[in-house]
């Protein structure tokens, strides 16, 4: 079986604590050097980053996108859901994967009322996790919603400090 390397949990320069030098072209260059077969775009929820994605990548019709150097990308974003249960705050990070620009744009339209998408590449949405899944899959059933860094203490579905 051939080896295949993918990284879907990545961020743009619009996320806190990330390099301001990040660009789609730089990500494509380094993915090629490191042997990554498919790289997530990260942060498709941020309007300026989505504009760059649309300019820098070509949609292939397979759910993947291609950079000028041939690097394959998948549309990804990380969001933080913030909700309260039994008087206790819970925050969970999720990775969203979308098969098309149209799906990403529709997701952004539906999520904007729950939190400003332009403040951070990893926006905080005031909604329960189940509602996020319902919204995203209701837009496009081929989308995926998966917990990010599930075992870390902070902002993880199984995290010791996530409020569960």
What are these regions (language model features)?
Residues 2-3, 51-164:
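Extended substrate/RNA-proximal surfaces in nucleic-acid metabolism proteins
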Residues 14, 48, 83:
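Feature marks short, surface-exposed loop/turn motifs that line or immediately flank catalytic pockets
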Residues 14-18, 121-124:
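Short, flexible loop segments at the rims of nucleotide/cofactor-binding pockets, characterized by
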Residues 28-47, 144-146:
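Divalent metal-dependent hydrolysis catalytic cores, especially in the metallo-beta-lactamase
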Residues 7, 41, 76:
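Generic enzyme active-site microenvironment
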Residues 5-15, 44:
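Histidine-centered catalytic micro-motifs
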Residues 19-31:
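Short, acidic/polar
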Residues 24, 46-50, 89:
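Generic structural signal for well-ordered secondary structure
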